Amino acid sequence: MNLIPTVIEQTSRGERAYDIYSRLLKDRIILLGSAIDDNVANSIVAQLLFLQAEDPDKDISLYINSPGGSITAGMAIYDTMQIIKPKVQTICIGMAASMGAFLLAAGEPGKRFALPNAEVMIHQPLGGAQGQATEIEIAAKRILFLREKLNGILSERTGQPLEVIARDTDRDNFMTAERAKEYGLIDHIMHRSTDNK
């Protein structure tokens, strides 16, 4: 069972109760704390669009603790991050793996962070296929296409040559926060909350 904490604020009109995620959203903070599927992506995209409508000139913070997930769902979040006007600061807490790492790198350059003990993992897209030979061939071509697309974007976001990205994503590649910074997936290691201002 997933218990969602409630916070209570005192206002001039009395008390107001929020679930913790709504309270964080009020401060322009979004938490991606699960595997990425269509439902999670729809929720994150809706929050990004809402915050843009609220104030298109104020930054948004996206905290990431995710094992990754669906490529298409992750790309929905990525594309939205790129088209909205507010800058999206990304912060890795715990682990940003696979599509989680991709979204971490997709943050506004100069505003991509990891906590000191966070880990980042990159790898090539995963996929399975079954059925007739032609269906398996179609699925394999799609995975290869997605790998090229994701590697190209990671190369742009990190400054690493495409060949290096292709080599380093061939297998699970785990990185400390320090290594992720050297690699270009993040810009800073956050030591105090004032670092993200």
UniProtKB/Swiss-Prot annotation:
It comes from the Bacteria. GO terms for molecular function: ATP-dependent peptidase activity; ATPase binding; serine-type endopeptidase activity. This is ATP-dependent Clp protease proteolytic subunit. GO terms for biological process: protein quality control for misfolded or incompletely synthesized proteins. It catalyses: Hydrolysis of proteins to small peptides in the presence of ATP and magnesium. alpha-casein is the usual test substrate. In the absence of ATP, only oligopeptides shorter than five residues are hydrolyzed (such as succinyl-Leu-Tyr-|-NHMec, and Leu-Tyr-Leu-|-Tyr-Trp, in which cleavage of the -Tyr-|-Leu- and -Tyr-|-Trp bonds also occurs). The active site is at S98 (nucleophile), H123. Its EC number is 3.4.21.92. Transmembrane segments: none annotated. The keyword Transferase does not apply. It holds the Pfam family CLP_protease. It is found in: Cytoplasm. Cleaves peptides in various proteins in a process that requires ATP hydrolysis. Has a chymotrypsin-like activity. Plays a major role in the degradation of misfolded proteins. Fourteen ClpP subunits assemble into 2 heptameric rings which stack back to back to give a disk-like structure with a central cavity, resembling the structure of eukaryotic proteasomes. Keywords: Cytoplasm, Hydrolase, Protease, Serine protease. It comes from Lysinibacillus sphaericus (strain C3-41). Belongs to the peptidase S14 family. Disulfide bonds: none annotated. GO terms for cellular component: cytoplasm; endopeptidase Clp complex. Its main location: cytoplasm.
